[in-house]
Amino acid sequence: MRFSIQREALLNPLQQVVGVVERRQTLPVLANILVQIDQGRLTLTGTDLEVEMRAAVSVDNAENGAITIPARKLFDIVRALSDGALLDVKLGGDRVSLHAGRSRFTLATLPAEEFPTIDEIDLVDKVQVPEATLKDLMERTAFAMANQDVRYYLNGMLLDLRDSGLRCVATDGHRLALAETRLDNKTSSARQIIIPRKGVLELLGLFSGGEGEATVEFGRNHLRVRRNEVIFTSKLIDGRFPDYEAVIPLGADKVLILEREALRTALQRAAILSNEKYRGVRLEVSSGRLRIVAHNPEQEEAVEELEAETSVNELAIGFNVGYLLDALGSLGDEKVKMQLRDAQSSCLLQGAERDQVRHVVMPLRL
């Protein structure tokens, strides 16, 4: 096996593939990437057995073959080469040599046969989604995913495929984020899958937000996303996601409309004196005004007052200020709408004019 390639042509696909490779592995071969040459095409594959990333690029002076090479070392070498360098790669025995100008490197390898790959998935459905749209949906909801929760099905994101379109939903049990879009190409059936947290983060890193289309393939146990020369595959979380629609407080009659940026900056200031552990702030509504109050164990206090469009006369409720700030940061609207039933119920937060992005935040007892 041998090939030649410009540094810049190799660096981008290599960077995408190396991202999924964990630094500490139980299997030595998982610290490597699979390098395959076939008919002048170089395919790079990295995996951690949960997520797989595969990228392809054309090369010169190619001889077919396959081997696995230490991922991090190869990436560091290519990144450190001079701009415009031509890299020659040649396999000899159980070593691979890399030549670029006056630089020469020799790396240990492992057989390609030892590398675990996901070749085919049991495809049950697929949709075309604008890349920028899918990235936007995931960015607006990913922050609400749980991390290492014993309820393993919360450690990821729900993709809810339905007749009307696609929804991305994430929750950690304390707050919920939902974003949806309509799809031009209707799906054959409704379907729900849960992508693990790492898969979501890798997908967000993969998307550039360009104008292209991403093909999303739904398998029984896997999700696959095809984008240009890159194929991303992730195992799915085998669990049942909570009935998130039951969590959304529909029909909440206590409504406040506020300037998003004014509310966000007021909460940021109040958060300075909130309890560092619970991050609690108290929202007090009366006579067209919202009062934000924060205290800490040192008996220090922060008070912020904002004008609000509301018919609510008297209401006081506590929230984790970090959850409110995350939700507001996800909304792009000038004005936001807060909807509540009472002082013990959750808050529905969305744009004042549209509801494609919705957030639910559970209250705190202060």
Protein language model regions, located:
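Structural preference for solvent-exposed beta-strand-turn elements
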Residues: 1-366
